[in-house]
Amino acid sequence: MIFEYSEKYGVSLFAGDRDRARVRDLIGCDFRVLPKTEFSENSIDVFGSVIARAWYDADDILIGIEFYAMCSEFYFSGRQVLGKEFQYLENFLSTLGVVFDVEEDGTGISINSGRLRFYIPDMLESGPLAEVKSVYVDFK
């Protein structure tokens, strides 16, 4: 599946209403529900085998979604970033003049005050060759 970042809406597909039923309809594939835990406000939807995982608030409004490199494409400013090497992403963001912060635990980077996070788990070991495994969009 293909998704695109929107500074205004987080993900262009979710412009407007982001209630659980609409998110499920828009993604349009099989999903399973993981029960609420002590760390989440509500249950979590997992789409496909590894397309996306969505978090909702107590009112079933989307508050965050993570897209995975195995079965998704995620575009930022017109370029696919999932599955790319960190050096590609770093150079691309630099070209755009986008400043990023390295996560405290060294597992990725974030931009736009943490609203968009790139999970790069091997960043410390593999450096510029580490792969972007997922992208998390925060709607809070």
Predicted regions and their residues:
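Short helix/turn-capping signatures at newly exposed starts of structured segments
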Residues: 1-140
